[in-house]
Amino acid sequence: MSTPRPAPPQPGAAEGAGGPEGKAVAGAWEKGPRLGQRLPSIVVEPSEADPVESGELRWPLESAQRGPSQSRAAAAPSPSLPGEPGKAADNAGSECACSEDPAAPARG
């Protein structure tokens, strides 16, 4: 991989001998790494809303679904339920089948 650094002087020599072909190949090769260096990185910053446990997923409409407990259980599967205090024991058995047991949220 140390050969790419001396590569820029070589296309100049290939230009005179090979014509525009050497220039096109060198231009395509040079643009690739430059674009890769300018790609933005993804930064995740903590929000100041509600503190969320590590790994807990929340749907954007969770606040609208807090009223009817049955629709919340059907719409928000296990990722948001285990984080609730007091309901972790009840939801442990219904994690995979929360839609099959609609009475589970009514217990707690």
From Swiss-Prot:
Region of interest (Disordered), residue spans: 1-108
Record domain LBH: where: 37-62
InterPro entries (UniProt xref): LBH_dom, LBH_dom_prot
Compositionally biased spans, kind Low complexity: 63-85
Annotated signal sequence range: none
Comp. bias regions, Pro residues: 1-11
Protein name, UniProt field: LBH domain-containing protein 2
Species of provenance: Homo sapiens (Human)
